[in-house]
Structures are given as structure tokens and as C-alpha cells.
């Protein structure tokens, strides 16, 4: 099973307690071109995989010689890291050397292993892998794909072919020779060709590095009346994700993860879900604070609109024991009943309505 390319072995943690099995697997590969990583270290983010490095990533079986343990550890984030580490045209294989495209479809809901295989296969496809002719998971080589040219202006060309202009055909054929001995039909055709050549409009070349698409022949043609219209179907983006996908936890990209002890702010055009997460946390904290405030304020006595406390200072010289009640808080004693009220003139009527001062 030795390979000439660079190989990455993904080992479940149970093999660490069976070194004889792990050594046997390592012995079947070229040691200087083989790397070994433990799945649990990848899951906890203790190690990271280099980009576009491996030709083959081999998923090892557990101590029970099944893929049940690796399936339970491999998440969408791990598969994305594996795909990122594969070279173009690199393959993801399993130790049992059975292609995932040839495995059971997983329709038997009683078989948990089939369901795990189906989930793993779907996650691999969502991460960008495809099946080759042998049913193996392959990372497509995007650079090798050919570009399809856009053939625009076909309606204009068909219209010119069906209804040619008058400059391209003669109005009639005259076989009588002219005065200079040249056939009239030949001279007419020559003149027509000369006219066509000289009247061809000159087009200004497009600026370097700028591409232009001519949609002038498509104006005014409704889509339902277009016999050769595009076959593209409109896709409802809400149907692309199911209930299981919506219920999955949000995987935060490494660049969006905050530093220890700090809270990272969401980007202005956040698309990873961090903005919604922070907004939900703020709402929860605000609701908790409001509830705690209501609990504290519950035993406090509150005066209704019909309850009015009136302090009468119409009598001159009527002051408190300190004699500074009307001067303001800076001059009032600690037990003054008017602490918090603005300064007022002796003899002025002060009303307290719903804890609001009305002079």
C-alpha cells in the first residue's frame, strides 16, 4: 500500500494503546514521506494541517478494526481542514481500502455504521470533494478546468442570415456587356463588395484589461418569448439547508476567534454567525439585568399618582434642625429629609409627586 506521493495518516486515539498495530501501518509506508496525526489533537485544535501538501489522506480504523471511532470524531471542521491539506487531485481514503462511493447507501436506519458513513460522505462532498470513476473521494483540480466561452449575439447573426442586407446581394443579374466590354453583373458585384468593405464601421478597441459584454441584441425580448433562452433554474436559497443543518452549532473560523480574555467584535459584513451570536448574548444579559433590577425594586414603596406628599414652607423661618434645608445638599445634614431636592427659597411651597420635585 506504499505510495510515491506524500501521505497523511489520521489515527483515532484508541490506536495509541496498541503500538503494534500503529507500527505495522507505518511500516507499510515510506517513513520520510508519511506524516501521522491523532484525530483528537485535531479536534481540540492542538495541531493544524499544512495547506496543499498531501497526495493521500488515509483515515485509519480504530482498535476494533472499524471506522466507528473515526466517524464519531471527524466533524465538518476537521473535514474542511483535511480537504485544505490535500493537493489538487489528492484523495481521501480509508484503511480498509474500500471506496466510499462503493459502500452501502445508508438507507437502513437500524445500522448506525451506515448512517455514520452516509453523514461522513455528505460532509466530504459539502467540503468540496467529488467521486472519481472508481468511487474514491477526490479533490478536483480547479486550475485544470477549461473555461467555456460565452457565445453572445446569436440572435443578431441569425437575423442577418435570414434577412441579409441590401449591400450583400445584387438587385438583379444583367448579362449584357457594358460599354467597356465588362459584364454588368460582374461590375455590379464588384461595386457591391467594394461598398460593403468601405462602409464597415470601425470599432474602438476595448481598454487593456477591461472586458465588455454586448447585451444589445437581448433588449426587448421577454424571457417567455425567447425560443433559445437560458435553461438556468432559479434556486430558492432557503431550500439548500435542512432542519439538521440549521440546528448544527456555528463553527467559528480561526481568524474570528477572540484572544484569551478578550471579546472579538463581529465584522461589518459578518457571515459566520458571530454577529447574531453576540446580539443574542447581549439580549440575554439585558434581560437578566432587568429581571434582577425588578427583584431589587420590588420591596421599595412606590407612590401612586393620587398620593401626594406636600411640604409647606409658607411660614417664614420654618427650617430644619440644621437651618440649612433650603440651601441645597451641600449644606444639609445627613438625616435631612430634603436630601436630593434642589435649593429653594424659605417660604416657597415644595411638592413631591411620584418622586419628582415640583417647585
UniProtKB/Swiss-Prot annotation:
Its main location: cytoplasm. Keywords: 2Fe-2S, 4Fe-4S, Cytoplasm, Iron, Iron-sulfur, Metal-binding, Mitochondrion. Pfam families: CIAPIN1, DRE2_N. A motif (Cx2C motif 1) lies at residues 322-325. A motif (Cx2C motif 2) lies at residues 333-336. Residues 184-200 have a biased composition (Low complexity). Residues 152-164 have a biased composition (Basic residues). Residues 97-116, 149-210 are annotated as: Disordered. Disulfide bonds: none annotated. Residues 1-148 are annotated as: N-terminal SAM-like domain. Residues 149-246 are annotated as: Linker. Belongs to the anamorsin family. The C-terminal domain binds 2 Fe-S clusters but is otherwise mostly in an intrinsically disordered conformation. The N-terminal domain has structural similarity with S-adenosyl-L-methionine-dependent methyltransferases, but does not bind S-adenosyl-L-methionine. It is required for correct assembly of the 2 Fe-S clusters. This is Fe-S cluster assembly protein DRE2. The lineage of its organism: Eukaryota, Fungi, Dikarya, Ascomycota, Pezizomycotina.
Amino acid at each position: 500500500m506504499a505510495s510515491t506521493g506524500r501521505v497523511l495518516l489520521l489515527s483515532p486515539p484508541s490506536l495509541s494503546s496498541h503500538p503494534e498495530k500503529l507500527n505495522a501501518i507505518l511500516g507499510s509506508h515510506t517513513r520520510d514521506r508519511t506524516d501521522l496525526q491523532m484525530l483528537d489533537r485535531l479536534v481540540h485544535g492542538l495541531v493544524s494541517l499544512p495547506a496543499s501538501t498531501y497526495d493521500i489522506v488515509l483515515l485509519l480504523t480504530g482498535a476494533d478494526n472499524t471506522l466507528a471511532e473515526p466517524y464519531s470524531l471527524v466533524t465538518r471542521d476537521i473535514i474542511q481542514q483535511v480537504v485544505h491539506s490535500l493537493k489538487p487531485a489528492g484523495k481521501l481514503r480509508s484503511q480498509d481500502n474500500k471506496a466510499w462511493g462503493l459502500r452501502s447507501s445508508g438507507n437502513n436506519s437500524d445500522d448506525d455504521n451506515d448512517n455514520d458513513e452516509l453523514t461522513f460522505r455528505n460532509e466530504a462532498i459539502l467540503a468540496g470533494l467529488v467521486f472519481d470513476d472508481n468511487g474514491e473521494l477526490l479533490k478536483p483540480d480547479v486550475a485544470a478546468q477549461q473555461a467555456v466561452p460565452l457565445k453572445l449575439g446569436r440572435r443578431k447573426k441569425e437575423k442577418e442570415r435570414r434577412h441579409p442586407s441590401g449591400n450583400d446581394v445584387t438587385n438583379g443579374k444583367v448579362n449584357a456587356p457594358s460599354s467597356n466590354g465588362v459584364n454588368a453583373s460582374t461590375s455590379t458585384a464588384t461595386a457591391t463588395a467594394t461598398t460593403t468593405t468601405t462602409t464597415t464601421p470601425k470599432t474602438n478597441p476595448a481598454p487593456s484589461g477591461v472586458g465588455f459584454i454586448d447585451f444589445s441584441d437581448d433588449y426587448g425580448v421577454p424571457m417567455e418569448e425567447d425560443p433559445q433562452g437560458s435553461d438556468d433554474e432559479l434556486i430558492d436559497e432557503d431550500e439548500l439547508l435542512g432542519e439538521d443543518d440549521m440546528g448544527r452549532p456555528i463553527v467559528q473560523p480561526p481568524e474570528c476567534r477572540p484572544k484569551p480574555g478578550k471579546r472579538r467584535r463581529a465584522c461589518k459584513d459578518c457571515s459566520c454567525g458571530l454577529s447574531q451570536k453576540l446580539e443574542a448574548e447581549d439580549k440575554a444579559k439585558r434581560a437578566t439585568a432587568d429581571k434582577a433590577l425588578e427583584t431589587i425594586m420590588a420591596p421599595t414603596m412606590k407612590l401612586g399618582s393620587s398620593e401626594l406628599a406636600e411640604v409647606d414652607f409658607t411660614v417664614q423661618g420654618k427650617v430644619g434642625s440644621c437651618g440649612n434645608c433650603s440651601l441645597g445638599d451641600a449644606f444639609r445634614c445627613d438625616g435631612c429629609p430634603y436630601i436630593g431636592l434642589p435649593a429653594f427659597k424659605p417660604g416657597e411651597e415644595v411638592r413631591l409627586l411620584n418622586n419628582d420635585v415640583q417647585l
